[in-house]
Amino acid sequence: TRWLLSRGLGDVYKRQEYTWLRSLMDRHKDFWQVTEDSLDKSIKVFNIDPSMRNELLNLYKILSPYKEVPETLKTLKEKKFKLAILSNGTPSLLDELVKSNHLDNLFDDIFSIEQVGVYKPSSRVYDMPIKKYNINKSEVAFLSANTWDVSGGGNYGYQSIWVNRNNNIFDNLDFRPKYQITDLNKLIQLV
């Protein structure tokens, strides 16, 4: 299972494409269903033993943060920053991941696209924290490791920060992040 994920199966199995197509077609399914659909296609395309399906799906429920993340979040919380997650994930999965990683006391909010029924990079998603907190877009430091998400948040008006852990090349989406960092420790120096 780990070999499959290390070979990029997680990126290959069309999940992002499915979310974007569903958003464009106004045919919403929650992220867990989209994950299942895209994994089912990959199982066929890559001739993977179908009995591995549940094991592969369950890996999403045991994701762990990078080692510096909890301490960085604690530091930001001590500095009185409001911290939130803005994710395509389902509320139940996000809650499960946050609690299982003992991060639930660090976040003020968890925003799921399920609240608006469309996936990022729709501006309706990025608008959720703005509406709830009645703040200006430029007051939000928005971090992501995904260049499409950094571009979406930046295009919306957030101060986008790309977490580029692997020295990747930024996508050509007519947008550049305000900052690029290699891990969350670098964020403390920016705020």
Predicted regions and their residues:
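A metal-dependent, Asp-based hydrolase signature
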Residues: W20-N54
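Short, acidic loop-to-helix structural element flanking the phosphoryl-transfer center
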Residues: W32-E36, P50-I85, D95, S123
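Short, contiguous strand/loop micro-motifs
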Residues: D26, L59-Y60, F81, I113, ...
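Single conserved hydrophobic/aromatic residue that forms the stacking wall/gate
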Residues: T1-Y13
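Asp-based, Mg2+/Mn2+-dependent phosphohydrolase catalytic module
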Residues: K74, L86, T90-P91, D95-V191
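Alpha-helical elements of Rossmann-like donor-binding domains used by nucleotide-donor carbohydrate transfer enzymes
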Residues: G10, D37-K41, E55, E71, ...
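Glycine-rich active-site loop/strand segments that organize a redox cofactor
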Residues: Q16-Y18
